[in-house]
Amino acid sequence: MKHLRSIEELGKEDLLRLLDSTEHMAEINRRPIPKVPALRGKTVVSLFFEDSTRTRLSFETAAKRLSAEIMTFSVSTSSVNKGESLRDTVETITDMGVHAFVVRHKSAGVPWQIAQWTNASIINAGDGAHQHPTQALVDCYTVREAIGRSSFEGLNVTIVGDIKHSRVARSNIAAFTMLGAQVTLVAPPTLLPTHIAQWPVRVSHSLDVVIASTDVLYMLRLQSERMDQGLIPNLGEYGNRFGLTDQRAQRLQESAVVMHPGPMNRGVEMHVDPADLPNSLIHKQVANGVSVRMAVLFDVLARGGELNSLKEEGVA
């Protein structure tokens, strides 16, 4: 594939291929020296206009483990602060001969716009409240590992929290339903999108009603940086109604798993320490992020005979 900008751009076979490739990358990451020459000679630019810890560092680690060069763009020390436009920034970096941009931006649609200005590949690391496709891949892979199968038929996924402002929710809904899961959204009406009736989901305003039948409980933080005032009465009341408390955790099925994309707001959506939950996959999500992003970079940047570099390593 040339770009990865949204889950909707993928077909089911593409999604499964990337998850299978992630298994190969995970095997590399278990080695004493987790590095292969698969993308030697390729240059990846980390173009982040929003703060990030997990996504940015996992992409940079993924590129290095595939032997690609990584250039980290710093907005605070760039010509953007001198008034340079996004287009001029992209075209300037393209002229340096880079092969891929990993882009995060506060505005929806920016990865598609950048693709009009460069012949390099574009990987969307989050655009506003729109899409976060690699997080959805991380989550699907982590669930697949936990349940031991590729099909999510019969799986009840409950996503709780600020759906309205969540790019993770949008990408995960697309990915989980593509693999056969039933998705239920739980949030106050003020934190649901206005066009929610068009989405392939069920909606509830009570976590207590659905928690006992949930197989995957996916908690989201309140995105205060994108929220208008007055969408919730206060953090305390929100946490009491929609947070994962000890009492709610005890009502989960024994086989149910708990997930969160991070960063967590402890005492708001998470009242329990993930370390105290035997069924938490939160740390696995972080660990799997590197393998997933290795698979994406390889799929986007490997051309022709370069596949042999992994075949020679015995992992492709």
At which residue positions do the language-model features occur?
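Rossmann-like adenosine-cofactor binding region
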Residues: 196-273
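Phosphate/diphosphate ligand-binding glycine-rich loop within oxidoreductases
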Residues: 33, 37-144, 266
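Phosphate-coordination loops involved in phosphoryl transfer and adenosine-cofactor binding
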Residues: 39-44, 152-157, 255
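Adenosine-phosphate binding glycine-rich loop
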Residues: 255-256, 261-316
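Glycine-rich phosphate/diphosphate-binding loop of Rossmann-like nucleotide-binding domains
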Residues: 49-61, 144-220
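Short, structured coil segments at secondary-structure junctions
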Residues: 66, 97, 117-119, 179, ...
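Positively charged, low-complexity intrinsically disordered leader regions
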Residues: 1-61, 311
